[in-house]
């Protein structure tokens, strides 16, 4: 709960900061994620929508703080002894990226803007649903009472934005820094690429 309140406080601070000369941008991204557990990895499809407010700190240097809603999804089908089972996994997340950026103006309309910074992340839901003719339907809550998986993560994010007038084409990488497995004998980390389109209001 304290972590959730901290993220809410960060988002509220961004709205306050919006009253100081700031540029607001809305965006959508394709953001697949890889879950790495020891030597095993599992790939999820991912998408997000969000907004950011960029505040100028000095000539060419700014900080963009925002919030985004992100979803990871994975569907699998497996047949054993003629019985086909299907599994659907879905995770929803709120991210709060806080990115330092440096604007390199190519001309009046075009700029290249590299960025880097932390991104606190809070998982809202995580569910695995399965169905097969033999056992019927079942589900597992990733964050239930008996779960060993943490909701909170902290990413290091870096990438670049190509801005043409009010349009943004950007991409980068996010690296999960925290071990999401609460036990001592296992580990779970996440990472992923992202590409997106944005519009500066």
Give the role of each language-model region.
Residues 68-91:
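Surface-exposed loop and membrane-interface regions of Gram-negative outer-membrane beta-barrel proteins
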Residues 32-36, 80-84, 138-144:
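Extracytoplasmic loops and strand-loop junctions of Gram-negative outer membrane beta-barrel proteins
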């Amino acid at each position: 709960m304290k972590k959730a309140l901290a993220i809410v406080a960060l988002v509220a601070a961004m709205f306050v900061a919006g009253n100081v000369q700031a540029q607001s941008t809305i965006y959508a991204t394709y953001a697949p994620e890889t879950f790495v557990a020891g030597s095993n990895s599992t790939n999820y499809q991912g998408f997000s929508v969000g907004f950011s407010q960029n505040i100028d700190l000095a000539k060419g240097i700014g900080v963009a703080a925002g919030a985004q809603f992100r979803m990871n999804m994975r569907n699998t089908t497996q047949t054993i002894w003629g019985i086909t089972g299907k599994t659907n996994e879905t995770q929803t997340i709120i991210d709060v990226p806080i990115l330092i950026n440096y604007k390199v103006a190519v001309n009046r309309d075009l700029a290249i803007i590299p960025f880097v910074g932390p991104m606190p992340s809070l998982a809202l839901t995580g569910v695995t649903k399965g169905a097969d003719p033999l056992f019927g339907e079942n589900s597992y809550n990733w964050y239930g009472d008996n779960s060993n998986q943490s909701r909170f993560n902290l990413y290091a994010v870096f990438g670049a934005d190509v801005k043409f007038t009010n349009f943004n084409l950007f991409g980068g990488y996010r690296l999960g820094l925290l071990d999401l497995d609460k036990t001592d004998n296992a580990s779970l980390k996440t990472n992923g690429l992202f590409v997106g389109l944005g519009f500066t209001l």
